[in-house]
Amino acid sequence: MIELDINASDKSLSHRAVIFSLLAQKPCVVRNFLMGEDCLSSLEIAQNLGAKVENTAKNSFKITPPTAIKEPSKILNCNNSGTSMRLYSGLLSAQKGLFVLSGDNSLNSRPMKRIIEPLKAFEARILGREDNHFAPLVIVGSPLKACNYESPIASAQVKSAFILSALQAQGSSTYKENELSRNHTEIMLKSLGADIQDQNGVLMVSPLEKPLEAFDFTIANDPSSAFFFALACAITPKSRLLLKNVLLNPTRIGAFEALKKMGASIEYAIQSKNLEMIGDIYIEHAPLKAINIEQNIASLIDEIPALSIAMLFAKGKSMVRNAKDLRAKESDRIKAVVSNFKALGIECEEFEDGFYVEGLEDISPLKQRFSQKKPPLIKSFNDHRIAMSFAVLTLALPLEIDNLECANISFPQFKRLLNLFKKGSLNGN
């Protein structure tokens, strides 16, 4: 059995630790920070807003917040990070100054009205391009009034932007979503002194009476990154894998539960229960069966491209529905998955809110065909999750990915670890 510490810190927690430090009064320490491009964007923006960032050890930082958020003299560049743009929008909505947030072409084409509308419910002064649909975003910080908001989508980024505004508003605000999204923001902020209460699925957020408490966070491994190697184990005969030190928040392990329903042997071993549950995940290869994914989409939406690869190895037709938000990610992930599968000759079809895949069960005929004829180049669409999902498929098929380097956005060690897995020499180092 292979034991693997993927050394890929959780992206969600890394972003939040940096952003929340700006609401503290004293220096904060973040250990095992994810040095991916997205999280580094959040760190750079914190510096541009006046925070002092010191590198104290490998992947660890001491962040000293400014006495007051500084109005930057330049655009705040979020690059490809939607989390940075959406959470900073909530934070800056009540801060004195003019703030412009922009990103690369991909980010500036992703939907931003989903955060502008709830922030405007506070009477925040925020504008976006094309009638508030897209970035760049312009924010003129101003006093906020408390509000009650019911979100039409389950999105941790929307919820987090709302909470960050609500903490700075005049009076208590409430937020409701139709399905529980990731709850790291609520957990972290409550541990730092924020008054956030869950009343039968409705969040009540009271304004901060004092700055957040200083913190010293050590960030666990990202379950979304770990899932790529759970997938690798699930599609590789006779494989057994132990993933170490993984964040096991129940809102983040939906993909592991789906893979378990498909037939893979998966067990969890909780190691600690401090701020968040952290532990090990044991995976063993087994024949896979088809699955229909239609509920609790928020708990696995980032992993659906990887799950589509598992569906390819399953017996029967697998279906994904109610996942329209996949079209609003770094790429249109429904189109990306289906177009690549069709190029490989896989029976599949896309819907407005999902797709279906006819599992091959036996992939050897496809492998034999590609050994005689060069397979088509897999298009990553410059989307890290599409690139990594199809890279795992190269364990079974001789494929090439057009831009695997985009994995550096969230998982800089991915390519090296996958190559070691292919060679059978993966030792967790």
UniProtKB/Swiss-Prot annotation:
**Which molecular function term from Gene Ontology is one that the record holds?**
3-phosphoshikimate 1-carboxyvinyltransferase activity
- Name the gene: aroA
Quaternary structure, per UniProt, is: Monomer.
What keywords sit in the KW lines?
Amino-acid biosynthesis, Aromatic amino acid biosynthesis, Cytoplasm, Transferase
The main location class comes to cytoplasm
Q: What does this protein do?
A: Catalyzes the transfer of the enolpyruvyl moiety of phosphoenolpyruvate (PEP) to the 5-hydroxyl of shikimate-3-phosphate (S3P) to produce enolpyruvyl shikimate-3-phosphate and inorganic phosphate.
> To which species is this protein native?
Helicobacter pylori (strain P12)
Q: Which GO terms describe its biological process?
A: amino acid biosynthetic process; aromatic amino acid family biosynthetic process; chorismate biosynthetic process
Q: What is its EC number?
A: 2.5.1.19
Q: What is this protein called?
A: 3-phosphoshikimate 1-carboxyvinyltransferase
Query: Which protein family is it in?
Result: Belongs to the EPSP synthase family.
Recorded hits in InterPro entries, A to Z, give:
Enolpyruvate_Tfrase_dom, Enolpyruvate_Tfrase_sf, EPSP_synthase, EPSP_synthase_CS, RNA3'P_cycl/enolpyr_Trfase_a/b
GO cellular component terms attached to this protein's record = cytoplasm
PANTHER family named among the record's database cross-references? AROM/DEHYDROQUINATE SYNTHASE, PENTAFUNCTIONAL AROM POLYPEPTIDE
